[in-house]
Amino acid sequence: MPLTLSLNTNPLVNRFAEPDDLIDTIARDLRIRDVQLTHEFINPSWPGPVIRRLTRDMGAALRRTGVRVTSGMTGPYGRLNHFGHPDAEVRRYYIDWFKTFADIIADLGGQSVGTQFAILTYKDYDDPARREDLIRIAIDCWAEVAAHAKAAGLSYLFWEPMSIGREFGETIRSCLDLQQRLTAADLAIPMWMMADIDHGDVTSPDPDDTDPYAWARAVPRLSPIIHVKQSMMDKGGHRPFTAQHNARGRVQPERLLTALAEGGARDNEICLELSWKEREPDDRRVVAELAESVAYWAPHIDSGAADLTT
């Protein structure tokens, strides 16, 4: 299968809430089929009847428009310690939370859920023995989630490499090392990385660790979903692919596609993960600039727009 283009719903959180409003906007205005749904739209911590009702409503909107939820990801308000939390009861809460999230995404037709592998506190990260203990604990937590996710019908889990050590995967080498360890853990379903070409430790002595094209060459065989945004030298944010940012940005479609192909990309999902501050005039530019970003990539990667019915 060829590459497909998708959209992470981070920038739509709080700007949309009702399933029909969200999905109609994606289909009608953004013209993209595949969506990585962030948890804020159907939060696993909400009461069961609310989750079931909103999942039904979301499913109906998907069927009506042709939009597809391909995966579920924690959103802007879900970047938390999770399985790196030092308290066992808090970790237990998040095991159950992610099991519910797996059920929601499976019911919507998605194939995977994920977040960061774990986020450690300063105290725990700076103690090598404690750090190793929590890595083992986090893998055990993910193993329990994986068994549940398999029963729910998901195909894999994913973890997002970040840009600092205590959030894991901050360099290409550390990213590959953790992935090797997760593969060796032999979970009930695989746990792959979900790399972001704009992440990486800016203090690394290896320039590849902050080079979007080096990441694109390194990860496709291990990262079914790859986050992209317009990358600036200052790593200053999740910039959209608009004319203004493209004039100064590092990411060009032809060059990125070449790097991905060199890395073995075949049927990867290339996911736009963008953001705008809650400031005017940016706040009201979100839909138009998302649409511009989708249109920028659509000639190069299948957006699925032909399958939409709205």
Predicted feature residues:
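Alpha-helix N-cap and loop-to-helix initiation/capping positions
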Residues: 46-54, 85-97, 126-137, 166-177, ...
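Short acidic/polar active-site loop segments enriched in Thr and Asp
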Residues: 32-33, 68, 111, 155, ...
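Active-site beta-loop-alpha junctions enriched in small/polar residues
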Residues: 8-12, 38-42, 74-77, 118-120, ...
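Active-site acidic/histidine proton-transfer and metal-coordination neighborhood
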Residues: 64, 81-192
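N-terminal pre-domain/capping segments
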Residues: 1-110, 187-194, 287-310
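Conserved beta-strand positions in the central sheet of alpha/beta enzyme cores
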Residues: 36, 71, 114, 158, ...
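Acidic/histidine-rich catalytic cores of soluble enzymes
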Residues: 3-4, 139, 148-244, 304
